[in-house]
Amino acid sequence: MITFPHRHLLGIKGLTEQDITLLLDRADEAVKISRQREKKTSSLRGLTQINLFFEASTRTQSSFELAGKRLGADVMNMSVGNSSVKKGETLIDTAMTLNAMHPDVLVVRHSSAGAASLLAQKVSCSVVNAGDGQHEHPTQALLDALTIRRAKGKLSRIIVAICGDVLHSRVARSNILLLNQMGARVRVVAPATLLPAGIAEMGAEVYHSMAEGLKDADVVMMLRLQRERMAGSFVPSVREYFHYYGLDAEKLKAAKDDALVMHPGPMNRGVEIASEIADGPQSVIEQQVEMGVAVRMAVMETLLLSQNQGPRV
């Protein structure tokens, strides 16, 4: 019996330490399934999952699709480029049309913050936020946490340095919320132009120097420089950005010798991270991809099979 008090996964905000631990523990079990020769189960047989992606995302959409299929669900990927959205249909109209088909879960990625929450108010099925604007990306934070926990054995009392384009990063926001909830010490390292207002109030220590921000860090999480979201000149040049904030062997020396190197992908090699580091022995970037499928399996199972009879919001 699964007991989970939420009908949707719209963000890390609102999840308790117990909620997060339950999802991570179930994801650990999903890792075992994914490593078996026979990877498919029947736990979600007869249930329908629709992936509705308004932003291109090869790895996240593929991960959600694989997660659903490994659990035995019927999975439909809706291509927005070929849909009625291109003909002027609104987000709500599209959601209501899909809702009329009686899916069990709707996985949504959208460029507008709050899009997933809006849909959750309109549809009768569960909604999973696969990224909404610069707001949140909860499954990414969960897979990052799972990667760290499996490597370090814990999340509490570790130092995690999140470096780069924090301003435009929903990944950073979700990770800060989750890591604080689980008792980690979180730092953000970035130029002032790439930090959002109020970042310290979210529970992150702010640094503008990689040498200081990475000192004794257990985990170094690099963020992609999101040039497609930038309307102004946030950095003088890519070359200068890498000089000061790109992770190379010299900068990594400030962290602990066994520090993990992470990146949510896709990477800009030579911009936020050097290839020698991305492909080096401390990198767990490939493990993050593997954990992504496991976490999304855990989320789908937990939301759809929860036997909790209390209020589910």
Curated annotation (Swiss-Prot):
Catalytic activity: carbamoyl phosphate + L-aspartate = N-carbamoyl-L-aspartate + phosphate + H(+)
Domain of life: Bacteria
InterPro entries listed in its UniProt record: Asp/Orn_carbamoyltranf_P-bd (IPR006132), Asp/Orn_carbamoylTrfase (IPR006130), Asp/Orn_carbamoylTrfase_sf (IPR036901), Asp_carbamoyltransf (IPR002082), Asp_carbamoyltransf_Asp/Orn-bd (IPR006131)
Cellular component per GO, a single term: cytosol
Keywords of this entry: Pyrimidine biosynthesis, Transferase
Residues reported in the UniProt entry to bind L-aspartate: K87, R170, R224
Membrane-crossing residue ranges in chain numbering: none
Record-linked PANTHER family: ASPARTATE CARBAMOYLTRANSFERASE, ORNITHINE CARBAMOYLTRANSFERASE, MITOCHONDRIAL
Functional summary from the UniProt entry: Catalyzes the condensation of carbamoyl phosphate and aspartate to form carbamoyl aspartate and inorganic phosphate, the committed step in the de novo pyrimidine nucleotide biosynthesis pathway.
Protein name listed in UniProt: Aspartate carbamoyltransferase catalytic subunit
Source organism of the structure: Sinorhizobium medicae (strain WSM419) (Ensifer medicae)
